[in-house]
């Protein structure tokens, strides 16, 4: 499941730390979070789509690793990000 360009630009603008910032951890986590939401909805309607389920698991692992990195380097940034995204703290 791909994000459309407008939605992607909106997410980048909301989570960018400076102008033209597309690669910061916050932006990456926000984009992954949106893709995870889309795939979750897809899997609710198509429960036998195993390749999408594996892709979802990979995206969740990637998001978890990025969040772990942010938590380790700057805890305040981590707390703000998970509150903005509505992700539970583990």
UniProtKB/Swiss-Prot annotation:
SUPFAM superfamilies cross-referenced by the UniProt entry: S15/NS1 RNA-binding domain
Pfam families the UniProt entry points to: Ribosomal_S15
InterPro entries in UniProt: Ribosomal_uS15, Ribosomal_uS15_bac-type, uS15_NS1_RNA-bd_sf
Coiled coil: none
Any GO CC annotation of this UniProt entry: cytosolic small ribosomal subunit
Molecular-function GO terms, alphabetical: rRNA binding; structural constituent of ribosome
Claim: Secreted is one of the keywords in the record: no
Keywords associated with the record: Ribonucleoprotein, Ribosomal protein, RNA-binding, rRNA-binding
GO biological process: translation
NCBIfam families recorded: S15_bact (TIGR00952)
Role of this protein: One of the primary rRNA binding proteins, it binds directly to 16S rRNA where it helps nucleate assembly of the platform of the 30S subunit by binding and bridging several RNA helices of the 16S rRNA. Forms an intersubunit bridge (bridge B4) with the 23S rRNA of the 50S subunit in the ribosome.
Assembly and binders: Part of the 30S ribosomal subunit. Forms a bridge to the 50S subunit in the 70S ribosome, contacting the 23S rRNA.
Family statement: Belongs to the universal ribosomal protein uS15 family.
Name listed for the protein in its UniProt record: Small ribosomal subunit protein uS15
Organism of provenance: Helicobacter pylori (strain J99 / ATCC 700824)
